[in-house]
Amino acid sequence: MKKVKIALTKGRLEKKAIEIFKAININTRELEDKGRKLIFNCENEEYNIELFLVKAKDVETYVEYGAADIGIVGKDTLMETDKEFYEVLDLNMGKCKFAVAALPSFKLDQGYNRKKIATKYPNIAREYFRKKCMDVELIKIEGSVELGPIVGLADAIVDIVETGNTLRENGLAVVEDICEISARMIVNKASMKTKKDEVIKIVENISEVIR
């Protein structure tokens, strides 16, 4: 049985992924009692798995370059970049959406001034407004994008919305929904050939429990 290396996004997706792993009998003991460890042996009679925790934006890189055979990461991260791997499964967890949000008085389709849009996801925002044939100025920021319209940096924001509580608490509202997003499983292209049986087993077993 060949070893399969899995790169998992730290944080919220990590906890939900553990539940899925347990459901298909992957050994998660080390992962649940991890301390400061970053690499975990999840081997048992059914699987030979090594798992490591990384930041969301790094999951794709580990998978693309073959340091990981499989990755679990949000669709938001996949949409923002352009890397080479197979996207094989929608895990139906970590569900939220991309949306345009602004102060209630803002109208996206009114006025002739070029709109300023603050976002952590410039590529996603650019493509969205391109399809709407709107010429906007994108302002990339890494912190709380909700501040943009409040302090006058931007007219609106493009960001991930889960419950909408953060928007409401800061006096903002969703103007338009862009798309639904969720966690996805990605696979290194070479691994799909060299470790096909092991990878397909994991994909199929997870597919069964998330239906």
Swiss-Prot record:
It catalyses: 1-(5-phospho-beta-D-ribosyl)-ATP + diphosphate = 5-phospho-alpha-D-ribose 1-diphosphate + ATP. GO terms for biological process: L-histidine biosynthetic process. PROSITE patterns: ATP_P_PHORIBOSYLTR. InterPro entries: ATP_PRibTrfase_cat, ATP_PRibTrfase_CS, ATP_PRibTrfase_HisG, ATP_PRibTrfase_HisG_short. Belongs to the ATP phosphoribosyltransferase family. Short subfamily. HAMAP family: HisG_Short. Lacks the C-terminal regulatory region which is replaced by HisZ. This is ATP phosphoribosyltransferase. It comes from Clostridium botulinum (strain 657 / Type Ba4).
